[in-house]
């Protein structure tokens, strides 16, 4: 009887410890295939699901030349197969093996390009109320302008930028159909996204 009681207490302690270790807003992020999103692994970013055929590409705004500079992250409608560019998530906490919601991270394009940018996403303020995502960021933990987080929406995910309720913004899309710039605006719409290890274009 004592042994059974000891085992029961041990199981309860394990359950309590496990439950308390999962903090709200700290859940694992999953990709479009249902796998855990991991740091330093290439992922393609789609607008909502791949069915929409809108993908993050690395291009110069309003240029059809793939080598034209400077380049930035753009959400492109119906890009050709060679255009979507995968990113990697670089975590501030190097001991983590998965990407979690709300975790501070850097977003970096995988392939180097001839424009001389670092490849790390960074928000530059264009006006007092609006910033734009460009590619001259850094991996430094002190570079807050290059620090993002992933949050869950109802069905998908979104990127957020900034710290605290007074400064937090959501990455949204410009109104420039069919190629959209990525904007950082408070109280704006959000760019709902999904992550894919493999490119599946509709």
UniProtKB/Swiss-Prot annotation:
Signal peptide: 1-25
Gene for this chain: KTI7
Keywords associated with the record: Disulfide bond, Glycoprotein, Protease inhibitor, Serine protease inhibitor, Signal
Protein name: Kunitz trypsin inhibitor 7
Molecular function (Gene Ontology), one example: serine-type endopeptidase inhibitor activity
Function: Exhibits Kunitz trypsin protease inhibitor activity.
Sites where a glycan is attached: 93, 136, 144, 198
Disulfide cysteine pairs (residue numbers): 69-115
Membership in a protein family: Belongs to the protease inhibitor I3 (leguminous Kunitz-type inhibitor) family.
């Amino acid at each position: 009887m004592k042994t059974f009681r000891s085992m029961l207490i041990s199981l309860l302690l394990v359950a309590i410890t496990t439950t308390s270790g999962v903090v709200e807003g700290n859940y694992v992020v999953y990709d479009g295939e249902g796998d855990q999103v991991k740091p330093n692994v290439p992922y393609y970013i789609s607008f909502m699901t791949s069915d929409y055929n809108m993908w993050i590409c690395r291009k110069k705004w309003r240029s059809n030349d793939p080598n034209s500079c400077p380049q930035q992250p753009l959400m492109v409608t119906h890009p050709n197969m060679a255009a979507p560019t995968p990113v990697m998530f670089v975590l501030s906490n190097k001991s983590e093996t998965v990407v979690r919601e709300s975790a501070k991270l850097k977003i970096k394009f995988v392939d180097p390009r001839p424009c001389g940018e670092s490849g790390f996403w960074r928000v530059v303020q264009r006006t007092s109320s609006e910033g734009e995502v460009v590619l001259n960021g850094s991996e430094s933990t002190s570079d807050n302008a290059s620090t993002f987080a992933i949050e869950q929406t109802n069905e998908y995910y979104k990127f957020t930028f900034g710290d605290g309720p007074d400064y937090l913004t959501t990455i949204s899309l410009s109104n420039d159909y069919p190629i959209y710039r990525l904007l950082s605006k408070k109280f704006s719409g959000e760019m709902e996204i999904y992550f894919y290890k493999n490119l599946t274009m509709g």
